[in-house]
Each structure stands twice: as C-alpha cells, then as structure tokens.
Amino acid sequence: MIPKYGCLLVGLLTVCGAAAQHPDDEYYPYAARQEERTPLLLTDSTLFYRAVQTTPDLYAEHTAFNLPYVSVKRRGLNYRDESASVGVVRLSSRYFGAMRLLGADEVRYGGLAAADGVTGGVGGLRLFRFTADYPQASRYTAVSFTDRSYLAGARLSVTEPLGCGWSGTAALDARTGRDMHVEGVFTNALTASLRAAKRFGDDHNLSLMLIVPPSVRGTRLSSAEEAFRLTGDRLYNPAWGFQHGKVRNSRVRREFVPLAVVSYRMPVSQSTSLAADFSAEYGTRKYSALGWYDARTPMPDNYRYLPSYADDRETELAWLANDPRYTQVDWDEL
C-alpha cells in the first residue's frame, strides 16, 4: 500500500513539460532568443523529486533563474497571434513594407476571423491583395526620420506598363542609423522588391513577385534590477562596449531571407473561380553572442561583477559613475 501511494505522489508532483513562453517574431529588434532558462539548483529530495529533469518542480518554480524570459516576452498579445498572408501564402512582418510599396491593398480583421480561405489567429488577420485592374504608371518617394531602432529611412516605388499586357513595379526600402535611446542598438536594412503581372483575356491573371530583404541589426539584452538602478538608465543595455574608442555590440542579428511568390487566377464559371499560389522562402538568419571557455564571463552585469555580490563600495561608485569599464563589455581587455 505504501509503495502504491508513493508512486501516486510522484505522479502528482511530476508534470509534462510545455513551453510557456515563445520568442517574439524575428522582426522584433529587442528579442534575445538565444538565452535559455537555466536553473541554479536541481534538487533530488523526496518532497521535490523530479522524475524527469526537463520538467519543473515546486522548488524550481520558486527559485530558478527566470531573467531571460524578460527579454523574449512582450506585453499583450504575441506577434505570432496575428496571421498575415497574400492569397494563401503566409507572410512574416519583414515583408509588410515591401507589400505596401508594391501597391497591395491591406485589410485587417480583428479577433478570430476567416477570409478568402485563410484563418486568422486570436490577434486578428491581416490580408494583402493586389487588384486585377491594369495599374497606371506611378512614382512614389518618401523620406522618414525616427529615434527608435534606426535614424533615417527612404522609400522608392515605380510602376510602369511593360507592353504585351505586362506591368511591372519595382520598390526599394532602406533604413539605417542607431537608436537614439538605447546605446548599441542600430539598423542597416535594405529591402528590394519586384512584381510583374500579366492579364490574359478578360479574367486570367498571372503575377510574379520577388522580395529580397537583407538586414543587419544590433539588439539589446535584459539585465538585473540592480544594474538599472545603479546606472540610472531604465534602457540600460549590457550587450555593447567600446573597442578602440568605437561602440561595438556583441548581439548582432544578420538576416537574408528572400521570398518568391507566383500567383494565377482564372474563372471556371460565372460563380466559380480558380486561384493558385506558389511560394518559396529560403535564406539565413545569424545571431552573434559572446562565448568563453575556461575564463570569466565577459558580460558586465553578471551577478559576480555587481557591487552587491561582494559589498564592494569602489565597484558601486564605478557603476554610479557609469564607468564603461564596469558597466559595458570591455572589448579592449578580451
């Protein structure tokens, strides 16, 4: 009887593992998806026994190191809760700007919704559509300035008839510069897009679209409350430091993920039509991070380097003075 109740107790205290947090969309510049939840202590006592080490127990839920989740969890609905598509092809937010420059109409539906054979998420549904009408020749240029993620941007779009029933649109979207609030955060991105469309007869339409969005972004990291308090900066970023007098970020995201879409529309009868969409997306995503072996961690906000660890007054004064040798990555010493 005792072994039976012992097994029952173990079963009740053991739960199946499930991911409670999901990284934000890849376009979100502040996500730090490379960090992982790392428990400081694994117990093997009878009361807090964990039969499978990958599942949480009662003790770990109250004592484990959960700080990385601060950087990968946004408030409100997750970006992935909203679906976006052109036709039946799912779209990432990295292509939204290119779709608008190419002349697509944008329609949004709130909450759970379905339209044109596409089902949205709890965050709503965003649809991009191209009209079947023959487009008129047009030009569009714009210059923008901002203080978050990048400093300046420029957009250009040209639509021209190509003859033989073809029309073409070419667009460029460039963004560059540093964040004016968070040191180390910057963006250098260029999105080039092309679309060619041809109309056969009255209602047959063929379109070819290519979007190439290379980008390099410097991101930020979360930190401990003590680091924010000592520096007096609620946007403190421990990921950067000075190297030969210039700012260098250790967390840089490089992306090159082109998208190609081929669409065909044709009528079958007065009340029926046929639509076919083919897409291909292939590329690389790279995310840099500091690594070390048989050496001290170079991260400046590690708990061993904070004044509270050794009750060091000199270190506290250096942090209060925002000395970059203490508060930032010391590249010159690596």
Regions found by a protein language model. Name each.
Residues 73, 83-85, 106, 138-140, ...:
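Residue-level detector of the transmembrane beta-barrel scaffold of outer-membrane proteins
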Residues 89, 97-144, 151-153:
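A beta-strand signature from Gram-negative outer-membrane beta-barrel systems
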